From Swiss-Prot:
The keyword Secreted applies. It is found in: Secreted; Target cell membrane. Keywords: Amidation, Antibiotic, Antimicrobial, Cleavage on pair of basic residues, Cytolysis, Hemolysis, Membrane, Secreted, Signal, Target cell membrane, Target membrane, Transmembrane. Belongs to the non-disulfide-bridged peptide (NDBP) superfamily. Short antimicrobial peptide (group 4) family. Is highly capable of inhibiting antibiotic-resistant pathogen growth, including methicillin-resistant S.aureus. In vivo, shows high antimicrobial activity on a S.aureus-infected mouse model. Its main location: secreted. The modification Isoleucine amide is found at I37. Residues 1-23 form the signal peptide. This is Amphipathic peptide StCT2. Antimicrobial peptide that is rapidly bactericidal against Gram-positive bacteria. The lineage of its organism: Eukaryota, Metazoa, Ecdysozoa, Arthropoda, Chelicerata.
Length: 69
């Protein structure tokens, strides 16, 4: 009886540790999904239009190319 009780307590502790670890992971994943398809993010998609405008000169691109080589 004592052994069964000890196994039960240990398994409950391990299960609690597992649930807390996964809750952190799933919580971060849910926040990412929510921010990707939420009302605010869908409304503010036009802020990414400026990402594709190249304000870099040829000299800047050459310097970046040299840095990454």
């Amino acid at each position: 009886m004592k052994t069964q009780f000890a196994v039960l307590i240990i398994s409950m502790i391990l299960m609690q540790m597992l649930v807390q670890t996964e809750a952190g992971f799933w919580g971060k994943l849910w926040e990412g999904v929510k921010s990707a398809i939420g009302k605010r993010s869908l409304r503010n998609q036009d802020q990414f239009d400026n990402m594709f405008d190249s304000d870099l000169s040829d000299a800047d691109l050459k310097l970046l190319d040299d840095l990454f080589d």
